[in-house]
């Protein structure tokens, strides 16, 4: 059986939604930047890329119309390269990577790109209608289908007895680990600076806030 291997990785820094470093940067620009660098790091000819699969949970606004196809063109890949977008909500990027591997293992492709992109700052705005977003029958018969992540988190906390204090403690520990990793350059190799922003702008090194 054929095997799929990861030969390169690249990502952009992460910014806060609506007020962060990339709040006005299109998803195509972000994803295209990462794709371009990943292909370059892999030392492959862009013309040899068979497919680009990207996951995105909010495929509307600037992320509609096959964001994978738009992003690969933004990356400078030729029009002969196919693109496919996947929506599996929070697991969209993971599913895209798994699908990219499947394209090689089962479908005979040789080079694929898999990843995820999300720029909620440019998709959820005053024109994002939610009044008819839920199917009435599904909402009545299976209301859990439309649970938000915060509702899911509350359910998990109640079910498994996870206190708010313990979660806050773990969150702070995670933030401090991130700040430590940034200070020591542990993530430098995987981050591709974009417009001089090179680190994830989520933590303050001194406090972890």
Each PLM stretch: what is its role?
Residues 56-110, 144-151:
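Conserved catalytic cysteine-centered active-site region
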Residues 101, 106-160:
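Flexible glycine-/small-residue-enriched beta->alpha junction loops
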Residues 87-118, 157-186:
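Active-site-proximal alpha-helical scaffold in enzymes
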Residues 38-48, 160-161:
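Phosphate/pyrophosphate-binding loops at sites that engage ATP/ADP/AMP, CoA/4′-phosphopantetheine
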Residues 201-209:
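Single conserved hydrophobic/aromatic residue that forms the stacking wall/gate
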Residues 1-27, 158:
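Condensing-enzyme catalytic core mediating Claisen C-C bond formation in acyl metabolism
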Residues 11-13, 24-33, 166-202:
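N-terminal extracellular/periplasmic Venus flytrap/periplasmic-binding protein-like
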Residues 27-42, 67-71, 96, 149-156, ...:
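Short, well-ordered amphipathic alpha-helical segments that serve as non-catalytic structural scaffolds
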């Amino acid at each position: 059986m054929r095997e799929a291997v990861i030969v390169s990785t690249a990502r952009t820094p992460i910014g806060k939604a609506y007020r962060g470093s990339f709040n006005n940067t299109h998803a195509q620009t972000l994803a295209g930047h990462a794709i371009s660098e990943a292909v370059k790091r892999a030392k492959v000819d862009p013309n040899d890329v068979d497919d680009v699969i990207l996951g995105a949970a909010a495929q509307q606004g600037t992320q509609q119309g096959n964001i994978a196809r738009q992003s690969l063109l933004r990356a400078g890949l030729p029009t002969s390269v196919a693109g496919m977008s996947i929506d599996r909500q929070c697991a969209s990027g993971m599913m895209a990577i798994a699908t990219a591997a499947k394209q090689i293992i089962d479908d005979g492709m040789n080079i694929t790109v898999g990843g995820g992109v999300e720029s909620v700052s440019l998709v959820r705005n005053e024109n994002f209608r939610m009044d008819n977003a839920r199917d009435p029958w599904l909402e009545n018969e299976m209301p859990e289908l439309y649970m938000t992540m915060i509702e899911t988190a509350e359910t998990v906390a109640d079910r498994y007895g996870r206190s708010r204090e313990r979660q806050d403690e773990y969150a702070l520990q995670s933030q401090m680990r991130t700040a430590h990793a940034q200070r020591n350059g542990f993530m430098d190799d995987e981050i591709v600076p974009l417009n001089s922003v090179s680190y994830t702008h989520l933590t303050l090194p001194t406090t972890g806030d």
